[in-house]
Amino acid sequence: MNRDRHTIVALIGSALLAAALSACGGSGGGGSEETKASLDGAGSSLVDPMVQAWKPELRDRSGIDLSYSPIGSGGGIQAITTRTVDFGASDAPLTPDQADACKGCVLVPWALSATGVSYNLPGAGDDLKLTGPVIADIFLGKITNWSDSRITQLNPGKDLPSQAISPVYRSDGSGDTYAFTSYLTEVSPAWKENVGAGTTVNVPAGTGSKGNSGVAGTITRTEGAVGYISVAYAVQNKLRVASIQNAAAEFVPPDLPGIAAAAEAMGTPKPDNSIPIVDPPASAKGAYPISTFTYAIVPKDSPKADELRALLTYAIGPGQEFAEQFVFAKLPAEVVELNKKTIASIG
C-alpha cells in the first residue's frame, strides 16, 4: 500500500485519537447543549471508525446521542430484525429471507471502503502481490507454504521464505467475509463450487477470529499469517496489505484511488439499493477488486424516524468529510441522490 500509506497512517491515528477522546469525554469542550434524543445501532465493524467519528458532530448538530456496537454485519442484521437496536449496519445486503424477516427495512449505502488481504511475513516487504485464484487456493488449503511457486512467480526478486501459511478468517457473521468470499466466488471456480459467498461460510483452512480487531491481533501474533480485514483496521494496526490483481491484470493496493476507481465502474443499483462492486470489469483501470459499499439498515416505520433521517442525512453529507481519514472513498454523487430518496421515505 505504498502510494499513500504513511499519510493515511498519520491521518487515521489522529482521527481515531480524536474519536476516542470525544467518546470518553462526552461533556468536555462544546458539550453544553443537552442531548435531545438517542439512537442505538450495531453491526459492521468495517464502518465503525466512521460512525465513532460522527458521534460528536451529530450531537452538536442535531442533539442526538449516537451509540454503536461493532458486533459484525451478521449480528447487526439480527439486531435490527429483532428491533433490539434502532438501526443495523452491514457490508452485505439482506438476503430475500432476511429482508422478509426485517419487515419493511431499507438499505442506505452510506460508506465506501475495501477489504484488504493482510499478511505477517518478515522479508516480504510492503508490496506482496497476489491473485484471486492464489488467495482462494490458500484458504482452500491447496497452497500451504509461502515459497510455493504460484506465489514466488508473482513476486520476482523477492526471497520469500519456506514458511508455513496460516490463514485467518472471521469466525463471526461478517460483511468483510461477504465481500471477500463474493470476490473469490467470481474468480475461482473451485471456491464457488466448494465454499461460495456469504457473511458466514465454512472456510476449509485456517483459524477463525472474531471481528476485525480479532483478525488483526491474530495476524500480528502469527508469523506466516494471512487474513482478510477491513483496510482501516489494517492501517490502524500497521499491518502489511497485499496488492491484488484486478480484471485489467493490474496489481492494485486497497487505497483511496483503487476504491474510488471500483466505485466508478458500478452498475445500476439493485431494487433493494445494494450496489455490488467486487471484481469490477477490465475497463475499470486502477480498481481495487475487493471494494465494497456498506449499508445502514433502517425500518421505514421506526418510531425514531426523525432521528434516523437526521443521522442518515448527516452521514451521506457532512459526515463524508471524515472518509479519507479512515481509508474510505467519498460516496459517488449518484449514490447520494439515491440515498436522499430513500431517506425521505422513512417515517
Predicted regions and their residues:
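Flexible loop/hinge segments at secondary-structure junctions
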Residues: 2-6, 24-347
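C-terminal motif of bacterial Sec signal peptides marking the signal peptidase cleavage site
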Residues: 19-23
